[in-house]
From Swiss-Prot:
Top-level division of the source organism's lineage: Archaea
Organism expressing this protein natively: Pyrococcus abyssi (strain GE5 / Orsay)
Subcellular location: Cytoplasm
Assembly behavior: Tetramer of two alpha and two beta subunits.
A GO-annotated cellular component: phenylalanine-tRNA ligase complex
Enzyme Commission number(s): 6.1.1.20
SMART domains found in the cross-reference section: B3_4, B5
Binding site for Mg(2+): D331, D337, E340, D341
Gene Ontology terms describing biological process: phenylalanyl-tRNA aminoacylation
Protein name from the UniProt record: Phenylalanine--tRNA ligase beta subunit
GO molecular function: ATP binding; magnesium ion binding; phenylalanine-tRNA ligase activity; RNA binding
């Protein structure tokens, strides 16, 4: 969970009131945080706050925490409003970045009066959002620049690796390739773009480099100080919805400091957008749902008042609450999310405990013990366990694996297209893991025990989640034989007889792939990964793998 530092005096300045340490321990709960540490430095008291929600980047700064507390205490109510004025600034996005880092969104914030506290909060929020919400800059990276040194229009373009600029913290020019090799941030994040045909650059009309997303800003424009009055913010990534949210978080935090937000027109080949877009989002919830699940006998107006203290605009109509909520949030996906806000505003400590009416005695699931035994065997074979997400997308499951698209369980309203479906097999997740770790030493030997979700029309839910085991070995020395040795050892330890029958599969090399049969029924597949699949994942060493269903191997 994200942890971040704030000064007590800065928080109190933003809230508009002073509180004791004991009061602060309770107040930060409204912002889904806990007070993790307190210390004094140079006569100032500092808090380390531990956020308990990875889906609320708007709460990872002094500005966000203070804003939430002001509303929770009733100092302000309803939907926060932020004015966005137009500017004449335009950013042109190069189509060549489509497979490099396709999306960039931008904003200007002027009228800033930064001091050491507000400057450190801005930089800390930038880093926390990119690190956690942006998955170590893979999905979101943020740049902040002194706009007085920028000459619009601005171009987000594909650059040759031999182009040069002076990166932040350096005095001499480096080529883009040299930055990845010599600069601290290039070494840390270079794997995100190293294998791309072009590198992304953000430049102004005079050719001055602002940044090399997602690696490093330039020394010329990327150094922001307490003297800076006007900043230009860029957010780049792979998902337009996600980078838009990150931009909204940044600009509204600065607006809490008195900054004035100005929009930027962003021109792509096929469309144009104006950013930031702070249009409130809509949701609707049944009031009886709130009462039923909370167990609280709340009147309609009481629910309305509680929601307004959590920054909603509320209109009551026909037993429903029609809601508007701020554009810096994107975590409201179900009525339960609204219920959570009601309970936070009500106060969990104010809910009276009840004695459970049903006594049960629990025991472990024997099949879970079987899965744990599988894990122990894999570790004993010298493999490292990984745990990846059940959520994925069709490109990962099919296109990158060189197989035709099939029907899978898709999410109706995904937060991100990256997480728009449930996986039907695990091996693509292992390939993605290997792709993300090409900078690490080989050989790499990994496995995962996890669920695959399949469509089953005979069931009430039309789906079934099946436990599976997937194994992948990456290294120049690995062949089909190495994967089969592990499968042989596994089956021998389990006392299961099996055979391999030659087959064809687009993810594997023809003639080096077979289906795994137990009692004549297909339970999995094993083989050497096809070169096209390796290329799709930017993996330069051979990979052998197998994936099997676990239930057919289970003997109670």
């Amino acid at each position: 969970m994200p942890k971040f530092d704030v000064s007590k005096s800065d928080l109190e300045r933003l809230v508009g009131r002073s509180f004791s340490l004991e009061e602060w321990e309770d107040l930060v709960l409204y912002a889904k945080c806990e007070l993790d540490d307190v210390w004094e430095e140079n006569g100032k008291v500092y808090f380390k706050l531990d956020s308990k929600d990875t889906n609320r980047p708007d709460l990872w700064s002094a500005e966000g925490v203070a804003r939430q507390i002001r509303w929770a205490l009733g100092l302000q109510s309803g939907l926060p409003e932020y004015e966005v004025k137009e500017s004449d600034v335009v950013v042109y996005v190069d189509e060549k970045l489509k497979n490099v880092r396709p999306y960039g969104v931008y904003a200007i914030v002027e009228g800033l009066n930064l001091d050491e506290d507000s400057l450190s909060q801005m930089i800390q929020l930038q880093e926390k959002v990119a690190l956690t919400f942006g998955r170590r800059r893979r999905e979101v990276a943020i740049g902040i620049f002194d706009f007085e040194k920028v000459k619009p229009p601005i171009y987000y373009r594909a650059a040759e690796k031999t182009e040069k600029f002076v990166p932040l913290g350096f005095e001499e020019e480096l080529t883009l390739e040299e930055i990845l090799e010599k600069h601290e941030k290039g070494i840390e994040y270079g794997h995100l773009i190293k294998d791309k045909p072009h590198y992304p650059l953000l430049v102004d009309s005079e050719g001055n480099v602002l940044s090399m997303p997602p690696i490093i800003n330039s020394e010329l424009t990327g150094r922001v100080t307490t003297e800076t009055k006007k900043v230009f913010i860029d957010v780049t990534g792979w998902d337009l919805k996600k980078v838009m949210l990150a931009l909204n978080v940044m600009v509204t935090a600065l607006a809490e400091r008195g900054g004035k937000i100005r929009s930027v027109k962003v021109i792509y080949k096929d469309f144009e957008i104006v950013t930031p877009d702070l249009t409130p989002k809509r949701f609707e919830v049944e009031l009886n749902y709130i009462r039923k699940l909370s167990g609280l006998d709340l009147k309609d107006e009481e629910i309305k008042e509680l929601l307004e203290r959590m920054m909603y605009s509320v209109e009551l109509e026909d037993g429903k609450a029609k809601l508007l909520y701020p554009a810096f949030r994107d975590d409201i996906m179900h009525a339960r999310d609204v219920l959570e806000d009601v309970l936070i505003a009500y106060g969990y400590n104010n809910i009276e405990p009840e004695e459970p009416k049903l006594a049960v005695q629990g025991r472990g699931d024997p099949f879970k013990d079987f899965e744990d035994a599988i894990r122990d065997l894999m570790v004993g074979f010298g493999l490292q366990e990984i745990m990846t997400f059940n959520l994925t997308n069709k490109e990962v499951q099919f296109k990158k694996m060189n197989i035709p698209e099939e029907e899978i369980v898709e999410i109706a309203n995904p937060v991100s297209q990256r997480w728009s479906a449930l996986r039907k097999w695990l091996l693509p997740s292992l390939m993605e893991f290997l792709s993300n770790n090409t900078h690490e030493e080989y050989p790499q030997r990994i496995f995962e025990v996890g669920l695959a979700t399949l469509i089953d029309e005979s069931r009430e839910t039309k789906t079934i989640s099946e436990p599976k085991l997937a194994v992948a070995l990456a290294g120049s020395e690995y062949t089909f034989t190495n994967a089969k040795e592990i499968l042989d050892s596994l089956m021998r330890h389990l006392g299961v007889e099996y055979e391999i029958e030659e087959t064809e599969h687009g993810s594997f090399i023809s003639g080096r792939v077979g289906k795994v049969l137990v009692n004549g029924k297909e339970v999995g597949i094993i083989g050497e990964i096809h070169p096209q699949v390796l290329e799709n994942w930017n993996i330069e060493v051979p990979v052998v793998a197998f994936e099997i269903f676990l239930r057919p191997l289970y003997q109670p």
